[in-house]
Structure formats: C-alpha cells, structure tokens
Amino acid sequence: MLNIHNIEGKIVKEDDRYIVKDNTSLKNLIVSSTTLFPNKSTSGHKHKGQEEVYMFLTGDGYIYLDEEKLSVQAGDMVLIEDGVFHRVESGARGLYFVCVFDGKRYV
C-alpha cells in the first residue's frame, strides 16, 4: 500500500523545476510522483503505444495536450491517449501530481 502524497520509490529526476520519484514495485505499472515548483514547467514528451493517467493532488496550473491547454487543480484527473504530446506548467502555488503508466517503458 502507498500513500498518494508519498509514493516512496527512487528519485529519477531532480533540478530547479521539479522532483520526480518512481515507484517500480509492480511488474507492469509505474507509479510516479512529481513535485513541480511554483511557476515552472516540465519538458514535455509523448509515448508511442502508451497511455497515462495524471492525478493532480495539490496546487494549480495547466496541462498541455498537443495544442490544447487545460486548467488543472487539486482533484483533477487527466487521461492521456497514446501518442499525445503533454507537458505540465505550475501556477504560483506549484503542483504535486501522480501519474500511472505502463512499466514496460523501462524494459
């Protein structure tokens, strides 16, 4: 069992924009958390053959899905389809979000 506000796991990225932790306890899914500092943005990326679920737990900001800009806040969940470019931008309070994706990405 995990606490949604502390998924444990290993820090896989850390810089002046964010801290990203991945929990790889399951064989087929990765649970990843991102603490995105205030007024910062992720680099953005897309995946071929993979969908993702983003759950926003604290703060507010925006998620970009290809050319679409959506406002997000604590309690929002975004379903990201295969091949869609996505990046997250935080507001003045920063953002904490958890995403779940196919663990085979790292195989």
Residue map of PLM features:
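Short acidic-glycine-tyrosine-enriched beta hairpin
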Residues: E68-D82
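Conserved short histidine dyad/triad with adjacent acidic residue
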Residues: S32-K48
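Histidine-centered metal-chelating micro-motifs
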Residues: S41-S43, V78, D82-R87
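A short, N-terminal "cap"/entry segment at the start of jelly-roll beta-barrel domains
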Residues: M1-I30, S43
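Short strand-coil-strand connectors
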Residues: Y64-E68, G91
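Short beta-strand segments in beta-sandwich/barrel cores
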Residues: S41-S43, G59-Y64, R105
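Ligand-binding loop in jelly-roll beta-barrel domains
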Residues: D82-V107
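Glycine- and acidic-residue-biased ligand/ion/polar-headgroup-sensing regions
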Residues: G49-E51, F56-G61
